[in-house]
Amino acid sequence: MLSLCSTSSLGMVATTTATQKFDARRLAGVSYPLGFFDPLGFTKGASKGKVKFYREAELKHGRVAMLASLGFVVGENFHPMWGGELDLPSAIAFQETPLQDWMPGLALLFAIHEFSSIWTFNSPFGGELWSIRSDYASGDLGWDPLGFKPKDPAALKEMQTKEINNGRLAMIAIVGMVGQELATGQTLF
């Protein structure tokens, strides 16, 4: 949140780019069975920078949801902390753990990551507000120590499509897991 509020005050050099429509159907993530999926029309008439902003947000949310889904399953089956006594639904267990000591550190980690993403935005001074620079590839953190990123553009697009689709599924899955636990009051696994 801090990075979103400070983006306008910490913007890069002013640019004067004209807003041009961009065809989002060419991006990774367009695949069978849904094809291009934008039911609310966010990308209709949007510029390339704005579409990249939406894609960046989708990737971040998808990555967090993939980790949350895994953490949900592991957390309900493995209880090494706090004496292993908290075998409760996640919504209740979260309130029973002494997380107040962890929250400032966790908030700091999120703030550092979000602060670093400020430099991916176009400047709001003369540029388009809430859009990503044209030289930045959405989701590319510039860190691939194991060399998983394919060199071939077709293979890269295929891998990006898999990540987008897995992230979309994970976002739906974590909402379903939390919803089911809240509705039944019991653990899932």
Where do the PLM segments sit?
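Alpha-helical transmembrane segments and their helix-helix packing motifs
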Residues: 4-189
